[in-house]
Amino acid sequence: IISSADDKTRATQMLQKVGSTELRFAYNLDIEKAKEWDLYISKGRGKTSVGVEELDYFPEPGLFLVKPDKTIFSAYIQSMPFARPQIKDVVNSLNFIIEKKYPARGNVN
């Protein structure tokens, strides 16, 4: 599931842009819920370099792999919109994890 702070119209436009018909997309993620997921919150600065109007406040990217028991297997939390994991890399990693029964790491905190 992909979640966005964007409204339905803008979220739908992004889904069409990526060309996927198989992704489930949630929208209107509120800032308090984003904070619960430990996402970084940024203040909008008007139009981006590609002409998109930023929200007043919005969460920076996060990617969470959640196990069937609803615990986190892996989390990628970013403070900038750059160096996001590519979906093909995530899929390849998931295939490896499933095939090799690779355990979660970072569990000794």
Model-derived features: positions:
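Chalcogenol-based redox active-site neighborhoods
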Residues: 1-109
